[in-house]
């Protein structure tokens, strides 16, 4: 665990060319405890500073765990850093583990509406204090810049904190992937002539967070 760091960023838009990073958050394990560290841009001129501080911190880790980070967070960090002439080798030298990419097969198995972080949290009954979206936080950040209201500052930090805390908590979903690789044992079956259906019951040794029962054509797993 000491080599892992969970990453989530908050931005003012979707493209680095017209947007900026206003918050970088990291969760890491140290001395038998989980810790959260956040770098907040309290003005439009402090983005470079938080990037430099974050890069100094991240060089101590070997794996970055994110949610859709390989598509969004990491490229965004690199492009924003490049705009300031910062060296981004530290990100290239760290392995990336994108939970979103690895959990794609789980969406169909669990019959999820989508693969958003909030959907996965709901499936696992993970509660969070913040209910707003990242898009809604952009307006909150701009309001903070105009007013300096510390309550808005806390709202921004909480949103990022809840996202960060969710990342380690959804990792047990990866165990569903082992279902496809494990050995199955026939536990029983029944044939119904009334409904013209065959039910097959199999045992799987994989431990998963929530039991799964799925109906397939001609059988039930």
Language-model features, listed with the residues they occupy:
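DEDD superfamily 3′-5′ metal-dependent exonuclease/proofreading module
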Residues: 1-7, 14-19, 29-221
């Amino acid at each position: 665990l000491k080599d892992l760091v969970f990453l989530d960023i908050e931005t003012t838009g979707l493209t680095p060319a017209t947007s900026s990073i206003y918050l970088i958050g990291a969760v890491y394990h140290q001395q038998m405890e989980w810790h959260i560290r956040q770098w907040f841009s309290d003005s439009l001129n402090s983005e470079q500073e938080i990037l430099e501080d974050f890069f100094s911190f991240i060089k101590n880790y070997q794996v970055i765990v994110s949610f859709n980070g390989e598509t969004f967070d990491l490229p965004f960090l690199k492009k924003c850093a490049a705009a300031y002439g910062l060296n981004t080798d530290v990100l290239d030298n760290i392995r990336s583990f994108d939970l979103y990419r690895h959990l794609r097969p789980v969406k169909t198995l669990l019959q999820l509406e989508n693969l958003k972080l909030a959907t996965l949290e709901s499936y696992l009954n993970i509660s969070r204090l913040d209910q707003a979206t990242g898009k809604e936080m952009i307006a909150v950040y701009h309001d903070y810049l105009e007013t300096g209201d510390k309550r808005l500052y806390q709202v921004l930090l909480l949103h990022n904190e809840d996202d960060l805390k969710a990342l380690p908590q959804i990792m047990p979903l990866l165990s569903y992937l082992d279902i496809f690789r494990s050995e199955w044992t026939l536990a029983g079956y029944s044939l119904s002539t009334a409904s013209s259906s065959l039910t097959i019951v199999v045992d799987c040794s994989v431990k998963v967070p929530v039991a799964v029962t799925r109906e397939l054509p001609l059988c039930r797993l």
